Structures are given as structure tokens and as C-alpha cells.
Design a protein with these regions (language model features):
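Short, charge-patterned binding micro-sites
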Residues: 65-70
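Short acidic/glycine-enriched loop/turn segments that link adjacent beta-strands
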Residues: 31, 148-151
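A short, aromatic/hydrophobic, helix- or strand-capping loop or linear motif
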Residues: 60-64, 144-148
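Glyoxalase I/VOC metalloenzyme domain signal
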Residues: 2-33, 37-59, 74-140, 156-198
């Protein structure tokens, strides 16, 4: 991504605060609600987050699938993985542990066996508008499908932001599940740190 040139050919720096920037339209969602890391060992990663940050409790998902899904234009389910999500304040912390070294969105960002930041998540009132806005910038669709009965996608914003951006359609099932994460974290006393949904 090119930096804006100033008079005399000088490149814009952080100190050039008087130069207006192009903001996203006012109706765009600007509040990230999730951060995700790809990890080589899910159980160890959960323990590190519990011990180091107090996030949690974490809810573990062992067999995650999408329907009507495409990976970079080819019909394909999401690459096999285990996952865990815990609440940390207003932010969901998601941990993804790929199973095997299958091609897909996890390995696109974090090569086999590695550890690293993967994506931020946005919960969208107007999924189609958010999707179109990201794609209009030249970003590519990495993966899209149905999860919990609602459209979800991963936009490849790695070239410009260094990570992917997940868009999730706001829907009653996700409201219930996300509410369970938040409720479990409120006043949590440390008991039952690793759970399953139910």
C-alpha cells in the first residue's frame, strides 16, 4: 500500500495530523468484537491465556464445519481445526488449532506448526454492505460459508493490515452463543475454566 506523498516528495508520517484521512462510511461497523490466534497446541494456549490474562472461561469446539462454503472460489469446507473462545472484557479471544497441514485460511496466514495472530472479527448488522465495502478496496475473499445458519466470511486483508478480517452476520443463534460467553465471564471465579457449549 502506497504512502501519501506530500509537497516536495516527502512521505506522510504520523506527525502530519493536519492531513485528512479517508474514513469508512459512518454506517460501517468500526468495533472489533473478536481477536484470533492460530496456535500449535490448543490446550496449552488456553492455559497460557487463563494464567496470564484471566480471560475465560474458554468454550471448546472440537468439530467445526461450514455449509455452502468456498475457499478462494473453490467449493470446500473450512480446513479441519479445534477451536476455543473465551471472553476478555468486551473482546472475544479465539484460539484456533489446525488439525493436519491442510490448505486453507489458517495456513494462509500462519504456516504449518506455527503460532501467530490470524484475524479480527466484526459482528455485522448489514453483512452485505460490510462485505462489499471490504471487497471494493481490492481485498480478496478468502473463505465464505454458513455458520450457525448465518453467512460468515474471511476477507484477506493480510497485504494491508497483516491479518484477515472475519465478518459475521448478526443472527439470533449467534446472539445466544455469544451471550453465553459473556455471561459466563461476568463474575467468573475461576472454576470450570474449560467448558463445552450447552
Amino acid at each position: 500500500m502506497e504512502t501519501q506523498a506530500l509537497p516536495g516528495g516527502r512521505r506522510m508520517t504520523a506527525s502530519d495530523t493536519n492531513i485528512p484521512v479517508r474514513l469508512a462510511p459512518a454506517n460501517r461497523n468500526r468495533s472489533y468484537m473478536q481477536m484470533c490466534w492460530v496456535v500449535p497446541d490448543l490446550d496449552a494456549a488456553i492455559r497460557h491465556w487463563l494464567d496470564s490474562t484471566g480471560a475465560g472461561p474458554f468454550f471448546v469446539f472440537e468439530d467445526v464445519h461450514f455449509t455452502e462454503s468456498h475457499y478462494r472460489g473453490t467449493p470446500m469446507d473450512v480446513a479441519p481445526h479445534r477451536a476455543a473462545i473465551g471472553q476478555h472484557g468486551d473482546m472475544q479471544i479465539e484460539l484456533i488449532c489446525p488439525v493436519g497441514d491442510h490448505p486453507g485460511i489458517w495456513r494462509d496466514v500462519v504456516p504449518g506448526g506455527g503460532f501467530g495472530f490470524h484475524h479480527v472479527g466484526l459482528y455485522c448488522d448489514d453483512y452485505e454492505a460490510e462485505r462489499a465495502a471490504y471487497l471494493s478496496t481490492g481485498a480478496q475473499m478468502a473463505f465464505e460459508g454458513l455458520m450457525m445458519g448465518a453467512r460468515t466470511c474471511y476477507i484477506d486483508t493480510v497485504p494491508t493490515l497483516g491479518f484477515m478480517t472475519e465478518l459475521i452476520t448478526r443472527n439470533p443463534v449467534a446472539d445466544m452463543v455469544f451471550g453465553q460467553f459473556r455471561t459466563a465471564a461476568e463474575g467468573w471465579d475461576g472454576r470450570d475454566p474449560v467448558r463445552t457449549l450447552g
